[in-house]
């Protein structure tokens, strides 16, 4: 695989808490004065001009000085640090753990402390994860602090808990004696300080209970020699010391702010940084930072400790994937600004050529000028729409995918149905060796010839094809070769494998554990490589296209130059370890040798020819290891550098082996869980109405009125399809002035409500399908997030306030239409985006009382309908000239633009204003936007597109061209009236 990502679009790094570099000295008074002049709120505290200060910024723009704090261990255990009540409480809890361990019998310690440790680990990854997730999305903890008023000075008379206030103030000011005032610090900072004390309790108890569990399980294996015991303990202590160094170096880089997830509460005016251990491994605090767990497991010589360590490590990666990474992407990796227009060739504007798509122009980073040569445009890589890799890209209509599936089924059948005799074992091993030779030598020869002579491309050009066809055929050939190479190896391994008769004998269990870990490591490495290179780099696209790509080192390539050199083959050695058979060891060895030869003889020469001096010599891991060596050793080069590179890459990545399986498993689990939740939504059953609803409120005071964007006239006309009886074909007679409400798909809907003046501040309005609720007085189905609170601050969530416009505007009795003499409260809210149903149907709004599901008012039912696009309204069906096609495409553009804007929530950052304007990059990140557009296009035009097509087209004009072309291609198979010279339909006869 390429040694770096050859892509013009560089994604920011995966994101961690490793990001803070100390700020340069600043003039504090000048900064405060400038901020105050600009209108920011600036908190003041006592400080000297000689100090180097770090500034924090709250979400409301308040700038404050972040005082220096100490790490958890120093704060608790150092005798030089002042102790407060919370410190003593943490130490007391730790002492209770030790007393419990001492009081229990040796037989009882293992199950008891296993349960205690799992409780604290669940509190860490589940409890802290839940708090941080809600703080990130809804500002929950800060809202709790605001509602409870625990940080409000009791002298104001607004704090209901003055004792707690004084306790917190004394505790925090004792912990931070310098540059900190409890009363003057921002609410977010004080909330973070309380949160970190809560974290201290969990982290210390988590580690203490783990160590006590390891002590309880510790033993010396039977028949173990003294030398083996010494080696086992020495290796264990090396891992523990390495773990300690990783944690200390990580804390040196990120400080307490990121260590305790401070950016979930406020931000520091500093830049992201990758220094020290963060240049050596991805997510070091969660990957190599858990090496000590395996060192302790090694010293304890206990499988119980090993497996509980793996579970804990996996839970930590789940915390990273589900909580930290989404927050980092949202805060530090915002979508880049989008292009506002696309330049088009004048030839494409003057005439529409059915054989040429404008989409190829939009792929280039810079639009081609007018008159660009077609040959030059062919040098650009094709837009990747229908990818090959991944189960979600599996398409049995594609010959490559169907061939791969059929061949895999054949290999599976032969493997299972044939006996494991020496003859068949030899046959399967030989087959695996042949496929490995083809995959490395045969594919390598093709790429070498392509690099020097463009031989693969020339072959297809000779027969009248273009570079795109050559590229597609190459991807299919390479994909088939790769899958057969690994499928044959798995089949050979299966034939050579024999189940252990006694799992407790020897190292059988350890071999299987390490073997599957190595296989998981290879899977994660492959996924990381694909994420960094993309489809273009994975299939060696720079051998086929001379695109002016910028060499970037992102993802796994930040730390390693050639991750596939060792880590990409870890699974082969894992299989060799599990089977312990010479034939599999031979296959793993020959695979490794051929892969190294492929990199050295094929990839490296091409990369040097293509990128020259821009190639990096040392990766982040090697660079940091060299820094730690004495100067004489740093001068060594050549083979010594290569040996060090390979050796340390293997050791470093082996410690990270628990992550890949979890990352894949968690994503699959979350997708399955979300699918189940959508299919079986949570239901709330209420047996009777709330007493206060029946006693204290008049339902006539509650009302809901809705306003929305009316759907197109075609949606109204389609309600009469001509299939009705004679009486039903005429327009319906209305006895009132209210007409049916039919709104646009995805358009915001404004809801106006009224309620009594003393209505509950926790009232809320939800959106439902009419058919989902059978009772009018009680709602029996979850709103699934489609609800808005009537008042701000009533709930511990910001999401439920999104769309709230006004609240509790008093309507005098004189303005009431029903003649009642009571004043009313009123408000407005707008449902848009994720608070809407993205489908067609009939819906209603329901006003609910006091955070419950008692219904006080129901709106008029309304319909969401997408009108179908009718070509006959644009041009005569018999006109087949190019001018007709141009008119139809223009009409499609006009009809499609407002729909696309609605699908993109009318967000100015992503929604286009014109036909040529690029979609925002958030469309590529979040697949929901493309899926909305695909559904609308299918309903409007009868053309089914894949979401990837929307992202690849990039603007409305390209989509309109694709839809117009698809309709022409599908016209012979359409069930609608023909445009050809066939017998006229009844309607055509009448018109003539």
Curated annotation (Swiss-Prot):
Pathway as given in its UniProt record: Phospholipid metabolism; phosphatidylcholine biosynthesis
GO cellular component annotations of the record: endoplasmic reticulum membrane
Biased composition (Basic and acidic residues): 11-21
Residue ranges annotated as Cytoplasmic topological domain: 106-111, 219-225, 301-302, 425-426, 498-524, 603-992
TM ranges: 85-105, 112-132, 198-218, 226-246, 280-300, 303-323, 404-424, 427-447, 478-497, 525-545, 582-602
EC number: 2.1.1.17
Catalytic activity: a 1,2-diacyl-sn-glycero-3-phosphoethanolamine + S-adenosyl-L-methionine = a 1,2-diacyl-sn-glycero-3-phospho-N-methylethanolamine + S-adenosyl-L-homocysteine + H(+)
Comp. bias regions, Polar residues: 1-10, 709-719
Enzyme class: transferase
Entries under Pfam families matching the protein: PEMT
Superkingdom, taxonomy of origin: Eukaryota
GO molecular function: phosphatidylethanolamine N-methyltransferase activity
Keyword S-adenosyl-L-methionine assigned: yes
Chain segments carrying region Disordered: 1-27, 41-60, 708-733
Database matches in PANTHER family: PHOSPHATIDYLETHANOLAMINE N-METHYLTRANSFERASE
Protein name: Phosphatidylethanolamine N-methyltransferase
Origin species: Talaromyces marneffei (strain ATCC 18224 / CBS 334.59 / QM 7333)
Lineage: Eukaryota, Fungi, Dikarya, Ascomycota, Pezizomycotina
Gene designation: cho2
């Amino acid at each position: 695989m390429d040694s770096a990502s050859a892509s013009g679009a560089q994604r920011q790094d995966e994101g961690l808490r490793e990001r803070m570099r100390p700020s340069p000295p600043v003039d504090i008074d000048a900064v405060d004065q400038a901020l105050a002049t600009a209108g920011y709120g600036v908190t003041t505290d006592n400080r000297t001009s000689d100090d180097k200060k770090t500034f924090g910024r709250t979400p409301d723009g308040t700038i404050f000085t972040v005082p220096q704090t100490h790490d958890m261990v120093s704060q608790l255990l150092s005798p030089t640090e002042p102790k407060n009540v919370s410190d003593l409480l943490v130490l007391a809890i730790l002492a209770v753990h030790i007393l419990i361990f001492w009081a229990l019998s040796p037989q009882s310690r293992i199950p008891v402390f296993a349960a205690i440790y799992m409780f604290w680990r669940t509190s860490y990854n589940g409890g802290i994860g839940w708090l941080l997730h809600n703080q990130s999305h809804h500002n929950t903890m800060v809202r709790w602090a605001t509602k409870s008023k625990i940080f409000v000075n009791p002298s104001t008379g607004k704090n209901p808990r003055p004792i707690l206030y004084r306790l917190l103030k004394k505790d925090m000011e004792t912990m931070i004696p310098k540059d900190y005032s409890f009363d003057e610090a921002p609410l977010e900072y004080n909330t973070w300080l309380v949160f970190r004390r809560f974290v201290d309790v969990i982290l210390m108890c988590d580690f203490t209970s783990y160590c006590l569990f390891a002590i309880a399980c510790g033993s010396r294996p039977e028949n173990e020699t003294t030398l083996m015991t010494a080696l086992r303990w020495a290796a264990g202590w090396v891992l523990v010391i390495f773990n300690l160094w990783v944690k200390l170096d990580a804390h040196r880089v990120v400080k307490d702010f990121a260590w305790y997830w401070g950016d979930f509460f406020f931000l520091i005016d500093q830049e992201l940084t990758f220094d020290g251990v963060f240049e050596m491994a991805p997510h070091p605090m969660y990957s190599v930072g858990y090496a000590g767990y395996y060192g302790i497991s090694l010293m304890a010589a206990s499988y119980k400790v090993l497996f509980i360590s793996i579970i804990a490590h996996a839970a930590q990666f789940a915390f990273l994937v589900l909580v930290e990474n989404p927050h980092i992407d949202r805060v530090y990796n915002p979508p880049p600004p989008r292009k506002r227009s696309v330049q088009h060739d004048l030839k494409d504007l003057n005439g529409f050529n059915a054989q040429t798509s404008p989409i190829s122009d939009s792929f280039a980073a810079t639009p081609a000028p007018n008159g660009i040569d077609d040959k030059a445009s062919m040098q650009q890589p094709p837009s990747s729409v229908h990818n090959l890799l991944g189960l979600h890209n599996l398409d049995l209509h594609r010959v490559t995918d169907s061939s791969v599936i059929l061949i895999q089924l054949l290999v599976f059948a032969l493997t299972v149905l044939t006996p494991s005799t020496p003859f068949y074992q030899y046959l399967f091993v030989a087959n695996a060796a042949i496929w490995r030779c083809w995959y490395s030598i045969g594919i390598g020869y093709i790429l070498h010839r392509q690099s020097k002579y463009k031989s693969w491309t020339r072959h297809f050009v000779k027969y009248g094809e273009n570079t795109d066809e050559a590229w597609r055929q190459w991807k299919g050939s390479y994909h088939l070769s790769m899958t057969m190479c690994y499928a044959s190896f798995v089949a050979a391994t299966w034939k050579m494998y024999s189940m252990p008769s006694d799992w407790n004998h020897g190292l059988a269990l350890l071999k299987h554990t390490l073997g599957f870990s190595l296989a998981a490591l290879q899977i994660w490495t492959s996924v990381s490589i694909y994420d960094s290179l993309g489809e273009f780099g994975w299939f060696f696209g720079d051998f086929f296209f001379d695109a002016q790509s910028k060499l970037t080192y992102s993802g796994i390539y930040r730390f390693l130059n050639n991750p596939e050199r060792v880590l990409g083959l870890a699974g082969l050695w894992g299989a060799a370890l599990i089977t312990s058979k010479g034939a599999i060891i031979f296959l793993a060895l020959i695979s490794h040798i051929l892969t190294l030869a492929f990199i050295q003889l094929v990839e490296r020469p091409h990369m040097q020819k293509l990128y020259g001096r821009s190639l990096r010599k040392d990766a982040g891991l090697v660079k940091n290891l060299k820094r730690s060596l004495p100067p004489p050793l740093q001068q060594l080069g050549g083979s010594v550098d290569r040996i060090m590179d390979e050796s340390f890459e293997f050791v470093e990545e082996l410690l990270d082996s628990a992550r890949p399986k979890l990352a894949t498993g968690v994503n699959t689990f979350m997708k399955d869980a979300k699918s189940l939740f959508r299919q079986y939504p949570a239901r709330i059953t209420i047996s009777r109405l709330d007493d206060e609803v029946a006693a204290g409120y008049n339902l006539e005071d509650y009302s809901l009125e809705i306003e929305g964007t009316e759907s197109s006239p075609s949606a109204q006309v389609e309600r009469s399809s001509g299939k009705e009886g004679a009486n039903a074909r005429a327009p319906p007679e209305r006895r009132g002035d209210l007409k049916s409400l039919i709104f646009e798909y995805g358009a915001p809907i404004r809801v106006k409500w009224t309620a009594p003046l003393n209505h509950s501040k926790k009232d809320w309005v939800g959106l439902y399908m009419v058919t989902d609720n059978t009772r009018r007085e009680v709602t029996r189905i979850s709103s699934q997030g489609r609800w808005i609170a009537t008042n701000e601050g009533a709930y511990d969530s910001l999401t439920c306030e999104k769309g709230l416009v006004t609240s509790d505007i008093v309507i005098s009795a004189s303005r009431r239409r029903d003649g009642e003499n009571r004043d009313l409260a009123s408000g407005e809210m707008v449902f848009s985006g994720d608070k809407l149903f993205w489908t067609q149907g009939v819906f209603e709004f329901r006003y609910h009382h006091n955070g419950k599901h008692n219904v006080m008012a129901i709106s008029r039912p309304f319909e969401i309908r997408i009108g179908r696009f009718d070509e006959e309204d644009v041009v005569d069906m018999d006109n087949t000239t190019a001018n007709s096609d141009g008119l139809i495409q223009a009409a499609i553009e006009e009809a499609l633009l407002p729909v696309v804007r609605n699908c993109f929530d009318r967000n100015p950052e992503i929604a286009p204003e014109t036909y040529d304007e690029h979609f925002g990059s958030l469309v590529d990140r979040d697949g929901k936007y493309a899926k909305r557009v695909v559904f609308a296009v299918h309903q409007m035009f009868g053309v089914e597109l894949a979401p990837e097509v929307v992202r690849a087209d990039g603007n409305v004009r390209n989509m309109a061209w694709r839809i117009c072309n698809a309709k022409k291609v599908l016209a012979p198979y359409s069930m609608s009236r023909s445009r050809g010279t066939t017998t006229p339909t009844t309607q055509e006869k009448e018109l003539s």
